[in-house]
């Protein structure tokens, strides 16, 4: 009988007096009794002492719990030797007594032993049936609310599905619109390209044959003149008899020489490169551009909003610095251009001259002489009847632009100038591998009461504002 008694003693020693189950994380109080850590924590729920031992009722001024690891091993051994039997439904797992009450604070079912333990002494504990009736009433109200929410959810789901379907149709319609519109634009561009090439060919056939004919005729006249000059030079070397002999024919031929000068051909081309809708498309890359007063030449006068500049009659007393242009009559845009695509427009009006473009941040701003001859400057210069660039490419102008659009594609090394009035291409620089920081450059060149003004763009056709 010793073995069963030993087994029983092991079970009793490994059982918590509060939950009546094997110890879980046992701790020892100052009086030497052991409890599960969670059990004693719930039993001593009050924030301040004194705290009473659940077994001997000894009082302690403060919580002082020491882990009991040997007891934890003993409880684990007892659990393996005598695993707890399955708890029947309606019976407390801790005390093996019928569940007869319900704790409203912890939402737990309680037996009589749970109530006697003192763990729930300050809680709202009610008989099982009363608690069940109250909970059933609450659940029925919750069900009513949930059913209403479910109705709303189904309605919202139907609306969302309908919206999704409508959006899908809208996207598909818009996709077809995009495809149709761009196909139309492609056809329009092809037709416009063919029309421009045809006009160029017609202009070439109209202008070049007379020019070639005139050049050939002048070549024949030059050859006849050269032959006559050679004859006269030879006759001048002859003695008197040879010089005067048959002179009548020679003099007649000299008198018959009549040089026909070539016809004056206008150098302005009637056909210009103009792509429909290009300027409107470029305005997608618009950005706010303002002038940097710290870079302005002392002769330049800037507006208060830093969007307009003109060349004044007097030189202002401004502090000199490496950032300031002098003697070049220039000013830079404040915004650095380091990547991406950028487009801005400048109202130049009927100015006699101007210069626009970009330059490197570190370009020499104290250069004397030809400012725009390369050296980190990419500038288009207008000089009354024609324009040139730092690449030394000259091109006459039939109708000087009143507003100039500048488009920079940094990564592509592309810089182009357009007439924003009609979209015609003014000039494109050869592809350039840009590096470092670029800044927009503005120069009125000549004095005029009319300023150059950076336009405010909204992106649509004709949305650029006129000068303020």
Swiss-Prot record:
The coiled-coil domain and the B30.2 domain are both necessary for interaction with HN and PAX6. They are also involved in MED15-binding. The B30.2 domain may be involved cellular protein quality control by promoting the degradation of insoluble ubiquitinated proteins. Residues 128-233 form a coiled coil. The gene is TRIM11. It comes from Bos taurus. Autoubiquitinated upon DNA stimulation; autoubiquitination promotes interaction with SQSTM1/p62 and recruitment of AIM2 to autophagosomes. There is a cross-link at residue 458 (Glycyl lysine isopeptide (Lys-Gly) (interchain with G-Cter in ubiquitin)). A zinc finger (RING-type) spans 16-57. GO terms for cellular component: cytoplasm; cytosol; nucleus. This is E3 ubiquitin-protein ligase TRIM11. Residues 268-461 form the B30.2/SPRY domain. Pathway: Protein modification; protein ubiquitination. The modification Phosphoserine is found at residue 85. One of its GO terms (biological process) is regulation of gene expression. Belongs to the TRIM/RBCC family. The lineage of its organism: Eukaryota, Metazoa, Chordata, Craniata, Vertebrata. Gene3D superfamilies: 2.60.120.920, Classic Zinc Finger (3.30.160.60), Zinc/RING finger domain, C3HC4 (zinc finger) (3.30.40.10). SUPFAM superfamilies: B-box zinc-binding domain (SSF57845), Concanavalin A-like lectins/glucanases (SSF49899), RING/U-box (SSF57850). It is found in: Cytoplasm; Nucleus. PANTHER family: E3 UBIQUITIN-PROTEIN LIGASE TRIM. A zinc finger (B box-type) spans 87-128. GO terms for molecular function: protein-macromolecule adaptor activity; ubiquitin protein ligase activity; ubiquitin-protein transferase activity; zinc ion binding. The keyword Ubl conjugation applies.
């Amino acid at each position: 009988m010793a073995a069963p008694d030993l087994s029983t003693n092991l079970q009793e020693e490994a059982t918590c007096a509060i939950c009546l189950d094997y110890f879980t994380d046992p701790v020892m109080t100052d009086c030497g009794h052991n409890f599960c850590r969670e059990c004693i924590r719930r039993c001593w729920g009050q924030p301040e002492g004194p705290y009473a031992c659940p077994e001997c009722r000894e009082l302690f001024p403060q919580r002082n719990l020491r882990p009991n690891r040997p007891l934890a091993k003993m409880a684990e051994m007892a659990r393996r030797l005598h695993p707890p039997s399955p708890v029947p439904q309606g019976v407390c797992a801790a005390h093996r007594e019928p569940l007869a009450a319900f704790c409203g604070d912890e939402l737990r079912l309680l037996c009589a032993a749970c109530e006697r333990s003192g763990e729930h002494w300050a809680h709202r504990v009610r008989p099982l049936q009363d608690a069940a009736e109250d909970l059933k009433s609450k659940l029925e109200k919750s069900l009513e609310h949930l059913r209403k929410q479910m109705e709303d959810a189904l309605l919202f789901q139907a609306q969302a599905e309908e919206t999704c379907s409508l959006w899908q149709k809208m996207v598909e319609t818009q996709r077809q619109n995009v495809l149709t519109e761009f196909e139309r634009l492609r056809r329009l561009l092809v037709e416009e390209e063919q029309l421009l090439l045809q006009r160029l060919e017609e202009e070439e056939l109209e202008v070049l044959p007379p020019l070639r004919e005139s050049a050939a005729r002048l070549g024949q006249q030059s050859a006849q003149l050269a032959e006559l000059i050679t004859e006269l030079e030879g006759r001048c070397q002859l003695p008197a008899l040879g010089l005067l002999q048959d002179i009548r024919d020679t003099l007649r031929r000299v008198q018959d020489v009549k040089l026909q000068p070539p016809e004056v051909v206008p150098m302005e081309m009637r056909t210009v490169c103009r792509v429909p809708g290009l300027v409107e498309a470029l305005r997608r890359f618009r950005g706010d551009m303002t002038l940097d007063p710290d870079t302005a030449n002392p002769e330049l006068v800037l507006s208060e909003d830093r969007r307009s500049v003109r060349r004044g009659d007097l030189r202002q007393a401004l502090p000199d610095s490496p950032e300031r242009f002098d003697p070049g009559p220039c000013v830079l845009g404040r915004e650095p251009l380091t990547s991406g695509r950028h487009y801005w427009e400048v109202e130049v009006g009927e100015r006699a001259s101007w210069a626009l473009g970009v330059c490197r941040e570190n370009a020499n701003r104290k250069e004397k002489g030809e400012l725009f001859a390369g050296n980190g400057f990419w500038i288009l210069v207008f000089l009354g009847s024609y324009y040139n660039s730092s690449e030394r490419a000259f091109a006459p102008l039939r109708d000087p632009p009143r507003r100039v659009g500048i488009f920079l594609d940094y990564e592509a090394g592309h810089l182009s100038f357009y007439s924003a009035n009609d979209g015609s291409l003014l000039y494109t620089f050869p592809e350039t591998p840009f590096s470092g920081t670029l800044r927009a450059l503005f120069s009125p060149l000549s004095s005029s009461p009319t300023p150059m003004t950076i336009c405010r763009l909204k992106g649509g056709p004709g949305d650029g504002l006129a000068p303020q």
